Each structure stands twice: as structure tokens, then as C-alpha cells.
Amino acid sequence: DRTSRGLGDVYKRQISDRVAEMRNLPAGIDQRSACRHPDWTGPDDLEIKILELREITNWEKPIYIKVGGARPYFDTTLAVKAGADVIVVDGMQGGTAATQDVFIENVGQPTLACLRPAVKALQDLGMHREVQLVISGGIRTGADVAKALALGADAVSIGSAAMIALGDNDPRWEADY
């Protein structure tokens, strides 16, 4: 997992043989997860990557760009100008397990506070409701969904809430997973 603020840790206990094989990682060694994709370092590279993805998919699939909640106005603007179809803004309440507790609990902007600047960016570009806006990070209840939609999101994304609903409310390490 990644945080919107830097590197995420993937601890050796999380890297089972199956995960090591899927991700081509050595088992038994703590790993760092980069906060950005190595194929781009700026907005021009993002546009190139989006075009590359469009070619690979024959222009038949929507391109989603997920941004952390650090600079929602500017990152939404960049993603729209680069050609994204859908922008997912992930606020600080997202349920990552791959970083230190101090980051999980104290760093980033609250999810709903990220929404208004992202909507404003879309409105300023004349793209609100043209480019879809999805908000994620700590959306747990119907009231959270209603607030997000009322503030201008087209959809919400849930993660931890769905896991809890499925009975996974006691996260623990499973040696045989």
C-alpha cells in the first residue's frame, strides 16, 4: 500500500511466498513502496502514460488516476489536463496498513475536506460531471456517502467498510495465507 505522503512499508511478515512470486519480491525482507510510479516525474509524463494506456486498451476503457489528498485542486487539474476520465481523490482516513501509525493517524487532509477543492478544479476547467470524481478514504456510512455526493462527488469508493461488512473486522497475521 502507499500513502499520499511518501513511502509505504511492506514488512517481511506481509510478503508470503505467494505475494513474493506475484510481485517479484524476495521473501523475508522488508520492502519500501514508492509513492509514485517510476514512469513519470511530472505532468508531461502522466499525459504520455495515459496515451500509452489508451493505445493498449484501444481507447475502450476509462483511465482512472488516483491522487492523494495533499493537493486536491492542483492534482485534479493535472489529471484532467493529462486526459484522465476518472479522478479518485483519496483522503487521509483511508485504511492503509503499510506505513507507520503516526502517518495513518495524523498526516494528510480529511477526506471530505479534499472534495471541495477537487470539485472546484473540475468546475474551473468546465469539466465537472464530464470527468468523473470519486472520493475515497474513510467512507463508512450512508451519511458519508450522502455528504460526498452532496459536495459534488460522482461516486464514492469503500474499502475498509466493505471488509468489515464481510466480517473482516479483526485484522491479524495469518501464517498460512
State what each model feature region is.
Residues A34-Y177:
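Glycine-rich phosphate/ribose-binding loops and adjacent secondary-structure elements
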Residues S16-V19:
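ATP-dependent carboxylate/acyl-activation modules
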Residues D1-L7, Y11:
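Single conserved hydrophobic/aromatic residue that forms the stacking wall/gate
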